[in-house]
């Protein structure tokens, strides 16, 4: 079997330096951008927000907020909370890392990360991660479906950072397991069948179909290896290629991001990618910086590999 190999680089530049900031939203931090094309035209951007002390929504804890845009460039903050976290006894006592998609029934769906304090196999308290589902007619007002997905093949049944797509009338979810990306499929978007590890190393992925090719952006270590007890803060962005959105080439491309001054963006500031193709056919990837103070977007400066 082929092993993952870095075969080259692909160049991106910062498009919008500040899509929004944590202080504009009155939050302590904002991370995990997820974007969707609206049926009515334009785009919505969803974010995980950790409430600040002077929160505009009088909220606390970790919730999901949104912004709206007609062009993908100028963004307006939408008041209120899209997904409010549950109680300390709920699977989503923190509600974060949104992944938004349009269902076959033309409703909007969200697969977000629910975190709660649970007890691990050793009997110790530990934060647990599950993928939780919600539905909306308009993308603004959401109802929780009281459904969640966990992966018993992972330690603590860990599953987070979901990214969901429709491929050939089937829902495909990519999510983060134990520092890898796992694929599951569903015919109704509610009952999921775990398929296999799609990417053997990495976390926080986003997939997009662009110019008839499927691309996945994944955060990975530069060496494509995690030594024991390794941290992820120096991980960088890689680009993976697929012709069907299911089978991924083991030839990986390192994404080089330069800011408007031509300086390379630091690894720590490249986190939680969320990709979208705008109506003019151009690609954008949204990211948050270290500490979740800023959301910014990037665009390719060269043709992507096929």
Predicted feature residues:
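Carbohydrate-active catalytic/glycan-binding domains of CAZyme proteins
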Residues: 1-306
């Amino acid at each position: 079997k082929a092993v993952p190999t870095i075969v080259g680089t692909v160049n991106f530049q910062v498009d919008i330096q500040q899509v929004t900031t944590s202080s504009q939203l009155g939050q302590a931090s904002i991370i995990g951008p997820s974007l969707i094309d609206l049926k009515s035209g334009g785009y919505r951007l969803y974010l995980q927000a950790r409430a600040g002390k002077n929160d505009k929504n009088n909220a606390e804890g970790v919730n999901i907020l949104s912004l709206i845009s007609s062009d993908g460039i100028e963004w307006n903050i939408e008041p209120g909370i899209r997904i409010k976290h549950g109680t300390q006894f709920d699977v989503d006592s923190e509600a974060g890392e949104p992944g938004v998609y349009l269902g076959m029934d033309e409703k909007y769906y969200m697969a977000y990360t629910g975190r709660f304090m649970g007890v691990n196999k050793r009997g110790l308290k530990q934060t647990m991660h599950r993928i939780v589902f919600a539905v909306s007619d308009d993308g603004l007002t959401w109802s929780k479906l009281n459904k969640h997905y966990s992966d018993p093949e992972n330690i603590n049944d860990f599953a987070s950072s979901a990214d969901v797509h429709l491929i050939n009338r089937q829902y495909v979810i990519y999510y983060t397991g134990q520092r890898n990306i796992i694929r599951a499929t569903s015919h109704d978007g509610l009952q999921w069948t775990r398929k296999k590890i799609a990417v053997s190393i990495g976390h926080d992925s986003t997939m997009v179909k662009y110019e008839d090719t499927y691309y996945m952006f994944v955060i990975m270590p530069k060496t494509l290896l995690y030594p024991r007890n390794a941290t992820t803060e120096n991980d960088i962005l890689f680009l993976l290629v697929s012709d069907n959105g299911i089978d991924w080439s083991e030839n990986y491309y390192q994404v080089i991001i330069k800011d408007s001054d031509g300086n390379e963006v630091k690894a720590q500031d490249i986190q939680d990618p969320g990709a979208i193709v705008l109506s003019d056919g151009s690609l954008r990837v949204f990211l948050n910086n270290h500490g979740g103070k800023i959301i910014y977007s990037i665009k390719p400066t060269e043709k992507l590999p096929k």
